Amino acid sequence: MSRVGKSPIALQGAEVKLADGAITVKGPLGTITQAINPLVNVANNDGTLNLSPVDESREANALSGTMRAIIANAVHGVTKGFERKLTLVGVGYRAQAQGDKLNLSLGFSHPVVHQMPEGVKAETPTQTEIVIKGINKQQVGQVAAEVRGYRPPEPYKGKGVRYADEVVILKETKKK
């Protein structure tokens, strides 16, 4: 059995409902519904969830660990939420959150407007910082990657949009 799949999930104040091949996790920040793979059994035991493979096949074993991680992320998302911080490095690079849109000035001849999907919010504490928040870990990471993709950090000066914890290794310029 997978090591990740063996460990129980603490519900941390979230409500869980199991119904016809899906699990619904409800917490103070929202609700997430996730389909459960038929090769995985889910049992609710007094504030913890236990997952186990249906049989001893490699696929069922692997999926039990995957489903455990997905459900644990859903529980964390509806109780505490997820956030990803981005930093803009470069002269004139600015960001401004307006409702469900993120306006970016990244040195192009036109401003870049990124439409936020439902369930994801963007905040700009300063003009060069972006904080993307939401309850779905996959969606928050996807939006952060899309925003970074407009102007990834270049390897010579490091200008561009980077994750706050990202280390950009700079190349040396050509010598004569």
From Swiss-Prot:
- Per the record, GO CC terms? cytosolic large ribosomal subunit
Q: Which UniProt keywords apply?
A: Ribonucleoprotein, Ribosomal protein, RNA-binding, rRNA-binding
Top-level taxon of origin? Bacteria
Q: What GO biological process term is on the record, naming one?
A: cytoplasmic translation
Entries under Gene3D superfamilies matching the protein = Ribosomal protein L6, alpha-beta domain
Cite the InterPro entries for this sequence: Ribosomal_uL6-like, Ribosomal_uL6-like_a/b-dom_sf, Ribosomal_uL6_a/b-dom, Ribosomal_uL6_bac-type, Ribosomal_uL6_CS
Q: Name one GO molecular function term.
A: structural constituent of ribosome
Briefly state the protein's biological role.
Answer: This protein binds to the 23S rRNA, and is important in its secondary structure. It is located near the subunit interface in the base of the L7/L12 stalk, and near the tRNA binding site of the peptidyltransferase center.
Quaternary form?
Answer: Part of the 50S ribosomal subunit.
Similarity comment: family membership: Belongs to the universal ribosomal protein uL6 family.
What PANTHER family does UniProt report for this protein, alphabetically? 60S/50S RIBOSOMAL PROTEIN L6/L9 (PTHR11655), LARGE RIBOSOMAL SUBUNIT PROTEIN UL6M (PTHR11655:SF14)
Name of the protein: Large ribosomal subunit protein uL6
Q: Whose protein is this, by species?
A: Burkholderia cenocepacia (strain HI2424)
Organism classification, top ranks? Answer: Bacteria, Pseudomonadati, Pseudomonadota, Betaproteobacteria, Burkholderiales
| Recorded name of the encoding gene | rplF
